Amino acid sequence: MGAETTPASASAGRGRPRLERPRRPGTTAREQILDAAAELFTNHGYASTSTRRIADEVGVRQASLYHHFATKDDILDALLAGTVDEALRLGAELLDGAGTAAQRLHILAVADARQLCAGRWNLGALYLLPELRTDRFAPFRQRRAELREVYRRLSDAVIAECGGPPAAADLPFRLVESVVNTRSDEVEGTPAQPWVIAEAALRILGFDGDFSPLVTATAARLGVRPPQTPAR
């Protein structure tokens, strides 16, 4: 399906004022557009959602939406980027960071699972859209593949440390993304869920040590509170 493109009359200027007071969370119109699009894409489908409907949900004119995003595909790309870019940045730091591989993978798994759990909308469900197979979204597919490779490299290092099964190296990435299916099944997550996933990821790679130091270090690195009942 082709992308909706910017009308010539809408490309000039900085967009018209809002039709009414903001209806969406976010401090900028761009954030509010992304929130509305995320709800519509995840709940009603990408193909059936028009830019006009997104604009209506935000309370702006369609021409104002085009000031922020030239096409509907650009909106989808921005939403998808928010699910991988921060984890990819953190993962790149952790690959060359200090500490055991188990600690570094634990940090990445908790951080990545937290953002997938905490998002207002289940954006990971958009990974299965047929539109993502087109050339337009090749850069996103590449970034996600790079994140998967970061997980694999850290997992390989954990396996080497712990004498775990080499065939399990891809499983931590899959375990973290299981959050997407959990949310799709309308199962409400808990604050401890990312930590449980991170523990499972390490155990499946052969780690059988004490998790308390890992939890403490991960919480400190991410600036978050550890679960009330930390993994053992």
For each feature predicted by the language model, list its residue ranges.
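Helix-turn-helix
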Residues: Q32, L40-D74, A78
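Amphipathic alpha-helical interface segments
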Residues: A36, L40, A111, L175-T182, ...
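Amphipathic alpha-helical segments used for helix-helix packing
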Residues: R104-I107, Q115-A138, R152, D170-F173, ...
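Generic hydrophobic, amphipathic alpha-helix propensity
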Residues: A29-A37, I54, L79-A87, G91, ...
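Hydrophobic alpha-helical connector segments
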Residues: A78, A92-A118
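C-terminal peripheral helix-coil segments that are non-catalytic and often amphipathic
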Residues: M1-R14, R148-E161, N181-R232
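Arg/Lys-rich, glycine/proline-spaced intrinsically disordered segments
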Residues: G15-E20
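Amphipathic alpha-helical packing segments from all-alpha helical-bundle domains
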Residues: L88, T134-R174, A192-E199
